[in-house]
């Protein structure tokens, strides 16, 4: 719904494993129900039913709790239930997400992880599915029929030992999870502020990791799957809601994760952690992607500041930076399908077109500052100085998410991609490697959010080679097939290229769709340039070969822009070549034959689109 193209999104929680153990490798749902329904998959009984659901609540924190109680045989059986749902926003927003539940036996409450990106929640509700429930209570270490349990145990012992000994010295995931990132991003000028204008802010300390250490409940294991030692799925217990339909209620809030902290926090100028938590809760229960919502609000706030829209258009809301109350009201309107919030719920690409058509906005300006690629809002990192992450956003198949190529840390913090060739090669390797996790239902965090003590001494520390070896053991241990790291990448490469071709069939998947809004590459406005004038002037002298002293700010911006766009074009060429694609970003016939995906319709599509 958001990109009009191919989408996949992954989430933690119990649904995926329970579905597999119940006997299903995949679930395909065709058609549209005549009334609201719940699909119930009882793995214990070997039965699937479709049941009418006219009275159950729609928002996820209520619905999942009710269904968990309904379909569990007793209180102990609640941990055997997982629910997929999308809240009321899914009836109105293009970027509605899915909530996947699990039952926290220590808290005795239902919790969630999200498949957030791309609007899959909208698809669920369009089919009039209120929820999918799976039950499976027979789980053991043998449930997935492993071929060699000792190999799996070997990998487990190694990673669990590292987590126990090193996590507190590295990212402290077990206490604050991805909440450790805001101060690092702020320090390196990478924290998005005011719709990605800036990368740091004086009030960023209000969103510091120490704040989340205090707000997250400590002392309770927080893994979103059995046996996860990293246990990073933190939450805020006993949170008092201040707004919306549940005002005054005390709730458990899952998160916030970094993307939410930076999105509905710094990127819209909100540095109140309690406001961030409140928006986190309502985005979750309504079924709203926090990244897309945050960027849509940030874009609207910048357009409000620029005079493109005003209070008459926003229904009286003052969309100024830092107005958390206005942002929350937009969120509640979005969920109801009312007011200006309903427009915000359609995403940045829609807002750009709407503001040009209805309010006479400058098309170039809104294109430059509307932070989306392929219709998907950009994840919450400032990329002006990271050519690698620019490629990570622009060249990603699905749009500008960080699932395929989260390179910002290795590029800008650890400085592991110093050369142009390093960046181009990373954009070939990491999308394939990271796709492999999604294909196999595995979390990426035990791969690179904890690393061996000697990782820096390895030949390729950015790949964490010891952990790559872990996954070859896991694959062989489960399937009985011995594999190398190259074998794992080949699995992904077939899927990755096929997905690019499917996008091509749908009218996308070429070079023209791989460009970024310029703000992701460099400064758009004089305000931005002057905020980092020393840096940009130095780059003009040293990299572009231009003396900036005689130039106006506007001329400096134009010269720098021409240089940075040319660098990005060069990067596209280098990455396409490594991927086996032509200069237009289309997989070649040679590549699809090499991968064994040269089906007749694939060959015909490539010939049709390339003319040869």
Pin down the residues of each PLM region.
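Compact, glycine/acidic-enriched structural inserts
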Residues: 44-48, 60, 154
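Glycine-rich, N-terminal phosphate-binding loop and its surrounding beta-alpha-beta segment
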Residues: 1-29, 49-81, 86
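Long, continuous compositionally biased terminal/linker segments
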Residues: 41-54, 603-605, 609-612
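Glycine-rich phosphate/pyrophosphate-binding loops
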Residues: 13-46, 126-142, 289-291, 296
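Extended C-terminal regions of large enzymes
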Residues: 1, 68-612
């Amino acid at each position: 719904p958001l990109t009009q193209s191919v989408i996949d999104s992954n989430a933690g929680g119990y649904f995926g494993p329970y579905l597999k153990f119940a006997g299903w490798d995949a679930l395909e749902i065709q058609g549209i129900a005549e009334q609201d329904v719940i699909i119930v998959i009882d793995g214990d009984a070997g039965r699937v039913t479709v049941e009418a659901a006219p009275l159950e609540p729609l928002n996820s924190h209520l619905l999942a709790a009710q269904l968990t109680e309904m379909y569990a045989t007793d209180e102990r059986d609640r941990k055997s239930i997982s629910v997929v749902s999308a809240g009321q926003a899914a009836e109105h927003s293009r970027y509605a997400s899915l909530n996947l539940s699990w039952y926290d036996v220590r808290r005795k409450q239902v919790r969630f992880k999200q498949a957030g990106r791309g609007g899959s929640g909208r698809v669920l509700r369009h089919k009039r599915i209120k929820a999918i429930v799976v039950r499976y209570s027979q789980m053991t270490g043998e449930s997935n029929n492993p071929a060699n349990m000792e190999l799996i145990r070997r990998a487990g012992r190694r990673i669990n030992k590292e987590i126990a000994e090193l996590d507190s010295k590295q990212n402290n995931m077990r206490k604050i999870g991805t909440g450790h990132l805001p101060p690092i991003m702020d320090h390196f000028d990478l924290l998005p502020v005011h719709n990605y204008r800036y990368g740091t802010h004086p009030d960023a300390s209000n969103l510091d990791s120490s704040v989340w250490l205090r707000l997250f409940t400590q002392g309770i294991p927080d893994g979103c799957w059995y046996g996860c030692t990293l246990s990073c799925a933190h939450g805020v217990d006993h949170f008092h809601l201040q707004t919306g339909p549940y005002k005054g209620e005390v709730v458990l809030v899952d998160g916030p994760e970094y993307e939410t902290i930076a999105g509905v926090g710094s990127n819209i100028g909100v540095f109140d952690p309690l406001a961030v938590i409140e928006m986190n809760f309502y985005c979750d229960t309504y079924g709203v992607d926090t990244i897309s919502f945050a960027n849509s609000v940030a874009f609207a706030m910048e357009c409000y500041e620029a005079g493109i829209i005003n209070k008459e258009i926003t229904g009286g809301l003052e969309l100024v930076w830092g107005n958390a109350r206005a942002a929350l009201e937009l969120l509640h309107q979005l969920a109801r399908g009312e007011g200006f919030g309903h427009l915000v719920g359609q995403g940045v690409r829609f807002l750009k077109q709407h503001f040009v058509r209805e309010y006479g906005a400058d098309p170039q300006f809104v294109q430059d500052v509307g932070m989306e690629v392929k219709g998907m809002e950009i994840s919450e990192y400032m990329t002006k100085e990271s050519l690698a992450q620019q490629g990570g956003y622009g060249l990603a198949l699905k749009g500008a998410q960080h699932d395929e190529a989260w390179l910002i840390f290795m590029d800008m913090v650890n400085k592991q991609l110093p050369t142009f060739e390093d960046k181009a090669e990373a954009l070939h390797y990491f999308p394939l490697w990271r796709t492999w996790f999604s294909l196999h239902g595995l979390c990426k965090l035990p791969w690179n959010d904890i690393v061996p003590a000697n990782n820096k001494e390895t030949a390729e520390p950015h790949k964490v080679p010891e952990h790559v070896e872990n996954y070859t053991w896991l694959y062989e241990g489960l399937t009985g097939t011995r594999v190398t790291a190259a074998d794992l990448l080949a699995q992904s490469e077939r899927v990755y290229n096929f997905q690019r071709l499917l996008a091509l069939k749908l009218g996308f998947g070429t070079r023209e769709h791989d460009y970024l809004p310029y703000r992701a590459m460099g400064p758009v406005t004089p305000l931005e340039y002057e905020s980092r004038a020393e840096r940009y002037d130095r780059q003009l002298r040293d990299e572009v070969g231009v003396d900036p002293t005689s130039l106006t700010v506007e001329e400096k911006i134009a010269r720098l822009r021409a240089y940075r766009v040319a660098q990005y074009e060069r990067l596209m060429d280098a990455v396409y070549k490594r991927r086996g694609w032509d200069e237009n970003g289309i997989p070649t016939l040679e590549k699809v034959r090499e991968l064994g995906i040269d089906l007749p319709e694939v060959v015909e599509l490539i010939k049709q689109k390339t003319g040869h």
